C-alpha cells in the first residue's frame, strides 16, 4: 500500500492527470472495461473504484490528480476506499464492468479461470516460452 501511495504521489507531482491502480490478476479484463472506468471519471473529475466480488477487495481504482485515496488494498478494501474517499470529500463512482469482478487470488480461482478458457494451455505455453527467452 505504501508503494502504491508513493508512486501515485510521484505521478501527481510530475503532472500526470490520473493514476489507474490495476492488479495483474484480472483474467477477464478487457479494454472496454477500462474505457468504462475512464468514462465514469467524467473527464477525471471523479475517482472510480471497482469491487472484487469474492472478498470485497478493490480490483481497480482510478484517482485523478489531486484526489489521492490512501491505498488500503486487501480483503474488504472496497468499503474502506469508499469511506476514505467520503472522508476526503472526493467524488467517486463505482465501475461494475464484469472484467473487474473476478481476480485470481486463490487456487480455486485459477481452476475456474482455466476451465473457462479453452485456450488456457496454449496461452500458458506461449507465455512460458516467451519468458524463457528473456
What are these regions (language model features)?
Residues 29-54:
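Conserved donor-nucleotide/metal-binding helix-loop-beta segment in metal-dependent transferases, i.e.
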Residues 20-22:
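Short aromatic-hydrophobic micro-motifs that form the base-stacking/packing surface
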Residues 1-18:
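Short phosphate-binding loop-to-helix
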Residues 64-85:
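Short, glycine-/small-residue-rich phosphate/pyrophosphate-handling segment
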Residues 24-26:
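Short acidic donor-binding/metal-coordinating loop in glycosyltransferase active sites
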Residues 83-134:
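Conserved alpha/beta core of the MobA/IspD/sugar-nucleotide pyrophosphorylase nucleotidyltransferase superfamily
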Residues 62-64, 103:
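Short, well-ordered beta-strand micro-motif
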Residues 49, 60-62:
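Conserved hydrophobic/aromatic beta-strand scaffold that supports enzyme active sites
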Amino acid at each position: 500500500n505504501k508503494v502504491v501511495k508513493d508512486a501515485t504521489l510521484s505521478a501527481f507531482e510530475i503532472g500526470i492527470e490520473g493514476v489507474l491502480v490495476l492488479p495483474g490478476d484480472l483474467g477477464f479484463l478487457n479494454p472496454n472495461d477500462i474505457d468504462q472506468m475512464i468514462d465514469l471519471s467524467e473527464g477525471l473529475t471523479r475517482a472510480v473504484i471497482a469491487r472484487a466480488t469474492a472478498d470485497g477487495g478493490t480490483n481497480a481504482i482510478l484517482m485523478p490528480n489531486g484526489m489521492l485515496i490512501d491505498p488500503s488494498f486487501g480483503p474488504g478494501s472496497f468499503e474502506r476506499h469508499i469511506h476514505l474517499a467520503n472522508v476526503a470529500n472526493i467524488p467517486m463512482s463505482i465501475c461494475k464492468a464484469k472484467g473487474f469482478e473476478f481476480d485470481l487470488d486463490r487456487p480455486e480461482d485459477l481452476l475456474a479461470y482455466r476451465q473457462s478458457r479453452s485456450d488456457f494451455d496454449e496461452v500458458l505455453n506461449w507465455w512460458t516460452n516467451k519468458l524463457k527467452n528473456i
